Structures are given as C-alpha cells and as structure tokens.
Amino acid sequence: MTYQAINFHQKFGLFREQWQPKVIAEMNDYQFKVVRLQGDFIWHEHKDTDETFIVLDGVLRIDFRDGAVQLAAGEMFVVPKGVEHKPCAEHEVKLLLIEPRGVRNTGEQESERTALNDVWI
C-alpha cells in the first residue's frame, strides 16, 4: 500500500470548470469532492442525505427559503437532508463537499448545472 497525502491545491490545479465536482477520496460510502463555483446554482434538495460544504478559498452563501448562511475560508456548514437550498458566490469559491457516493449535485432537479457523478481526479 502507498501512503500519500492528498493536496487540495494540487487537485484544484487539475481542472478549471465550475459546478463540476471531482472526487478525490472515499471513506466507507462517502465521497470527498472538490469543486469550483461562481454565480448562482439552482434551488434543490437532497431528500435522503445531509450535504457538507467546507470552504477552502473564497466566500460562499447558501440561500434557504427562510434565510441564508455565509461561509468564509476555513468554515463549514451541514445542510440537513430535505432542506431546499441554493449555493451562490459573487467570486470564485473552492469547496470540499462531503456526501454519500451517488448523490447528484442538483438533487432530483435536472438542469444545465447537473454534473456527471463519480468523476475522479
């Protein structure tokens, strides 16, 4: 077995596209995904799972139907399952997402922002 640290900076250097999560590791049935984003996402929910957002660089706002939370680099937030939300960022943000394998980024919604799942880098 090879033991090697995963470097976020190096992983972000491998892609430029936004709103396309890339898997960098797995733990049990959970995937760790890096993603770049800027602008508004779509309103969506994940009915069967929570979703964790960890901001590595930039500022992210997650809108909810009854409020919002703003996250800066070094902060995280767990969106509870079944809660409709919409991530957005004025400037590019780099995130680490933690969610179960197979979770689609747009939940059950279909849009131009729906990304391929299980894309590894």
Positions of predicted regions on the chain:
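A short, N-terminal "cap"/entry segment at the start of jelly-roll beta-barrel domains
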Residues: M1-K33, E110-W120
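Short secondary-structure boundary/capping segments within folded domains
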Residues: V23-N28, W43-H46, I54
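A cytosolic small-molecule/anion-sensing beta-strand core signal
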Residues: N28, L56-D57, A72-A73, H91
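Structural motif
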Residues: Q31, D40, V59-R61, A68, ...
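Short, conserved beta-strand element in jelly-roll/cupin
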Residues: R36-L37, H46-D63, I98
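Short acidic-glycine-tyrosine-enriched beta hairpin
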Residues: R65-K81
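Ligand-binding loop in jelly-roll beta-barrel domains
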Residues: K81-S111
